[in-house]
UniProtKB/Swiss-Prot annotation:
It holds the Pfam family Cyt-b5. The keyword Endoplasmic reticulum applies. This is Probable cytochrome b5 1. Residues 3-79 form the Cytochrome b5 heme-binding domain.
Length: 124
C-alpha cells in the first residue's frame, strides 16, 4: 500500500469540528469523528485542527490505547520538507457551517429588544 502525501495547504483547510486533520510526528490523521469524544474536550482539539499537533500530543503523554486509536485515524504523511510551511500557513480555525454568524446573533437579540421597548411605549 502506497502512502498518500499531503501538502500543508490541504491540511490547514481541515480545521473545524466536522472536518479535522492533525499532523503528529509527520503523519496525517483525520480526527473528525473523534473530536467530540476526546477526553480533553472539543476545544483543545480545535486549537490544533489543521496544524501540527506533535508537541501538544507528546507533552500530554498519551496512553498506549490512545496511540493505537490514533493509528486507526491515519490517512497519510505530511509531504517531506514541508513542516515549516505548515507552521507558516496556520489558519484561524473556521467555524462550522451550522454556527450562525455574529451579526445574525446580534440581530436576533437587538431586534426583539427594540420591539419590546416600542410595544411598551405605545401601550402606556
Amino acid at each position: 500500500m502506497s502512502v498518500k502525501y499531503f501538502e500543508p495547504e490541504e491540511i490547514v483547510e481541515h480545521n473545524n469540528s466536522k472536518d479535522m486533520y492533525m499532523v503528529i510526528n509527520g503523519k496525517v490523521y483525520d480526527v473528525s469523528n473523534f473530536a467530540d469524544d476526546h477526553p480533553g474536550g472539543l476545544d483543545i482539539m480545535l486549537d490544533y485542527a489543521g496544524q501540527d499537533a506533535t508537541k501538544a500530543y507528546q507533552d500530554i503523554g498519551h496512553s498506549i490505547a490512545a496511540d493505537e486509536l490514533l493509528e486507526e485515524m491515519y490517512i497519510g504523511d505530511l509531504k517531506p520538507g514541508t513542516e515549516e510551511r505548515l507552521k507558516e500557513l496556520k489558519k484561524p480555525r473556521s467555524f462550522d457551517n451550522d454556527t450562525p454568524p455574529l451579526p445574525l446573533l446580534i440581530a436576533l437579540i437587538v431586534l426583539p429588544a427594540i420591539a419590546v421597548i416600542v410595544f411598551v411605549k405605545l401601550n402606556k
